[in-house]
Amino acid sequence: MGIRVYKPTTNGRRNMTSLDFAEITTSTPEKSLLVSLKSKAGRNNNGRITVRHQGGGHKRHYRLIDFKRNKDAVEAVVKTIEYDPNRSANIALVHYTDGVKAYIIAPKGLEVGQRIVSGPEADIKVGNALPLANIPVGTLVHNIELKPGRGGELVRAAGASAQVLGQEGKYTLVRLQSGEVRMILGTCRATVGVVGNEQHGLVNLGKAGRSRWKGIRPTVRGSVMNPNDHPHGGGEGKAPVGRKAPSTPWGKPALGLKTRNKKAKSDKLIVRRRNEK
């Protein structure tokens, strides 16, 4: 999809851009694959804020996405490419030959009328899903499982892709979008191709209201809060932090502190860290 640039007819329109939605073929979703979605506004079951800067926004239906792709040897035809308000990638409605309908993440280059299939014997074509052990070295993939049968968990955002680097016993070496090289079981499935809608990250919202439509609330600096709201708060005028190092709103060190569990069992599966040269 291309980027649409607006003329500066108002202050809010100045520098505003949006996607032109040229790839979208319908604006009416498949009703049988919709479920209601209640806005949580970043609250947990006690009503306390657990994720800040969330709330409001347009009402949405959740689209049930098939991340497992486990209907082996059953062909499906792509019927539509659709917008999904719950994710950055577009989705594709596919009709299987046995009558089942499903949504999948739409990879770049997938077109209406194209046939896709899942299973170990599937061809290396965009949209086909197969075990990592059956995918040739150098192939770009997305929607990667971490545990066989659990469904794709990695590389699902717009424009994202990972590359198969080789096989090592029962594991497959995969280079992720971040640059991290990781061993994943060869029986885990992945879908061939790059996630579509790669222009998504280039959109300039242009005004605060568009963030509010998306359910994103303002992010306030700690230095302009009161001392009871943030460790950086208080003081006369533009006061410095007043601590040895910047802190989170809960008093923990911010900026540069490693938050990954030092005893994570998956450490042994990481061949190269994302920040290693």
Swiss-Prot record:
Part of the 50S ribosomal subunit. Forms a bridge to the 30S subunit in the 70S ribosome. HAMAP family: Ribosomal_uL2_B. This is Large ribosomal subunit protein uL2. Residues 264-277 have a biased composition (Basic and acidic residues). Pfam families: Ribosomal_L2, Ribosomal_L2_C. Keywords: Ribonucleoprotein, Ribosomal protein, RNA-binding, rRNA-binding. InterPro entries: NA-bd_OB-fold, Rib_uL2_dom2, Ribosomal_uL2, Ribosomal_uL2_bac/org-type, Ribosomal_uL2_C, Ribosomal_uL2_CS, Ribosomal_uL2_dom3, Ribosomal_uL2_RNA-bd_dom. Residues 219-277 are annotated as: Disordered. SUPFAM superfamilies: Nucleic acid-binding proteins, Translation proteins SH3-like domain. The keyword tRNA processing does not apply. It comes from Streptococcus gordonii (strain Challis / ATCC 35105 / BCRC 15272 / CH1 / DL1 / V288).
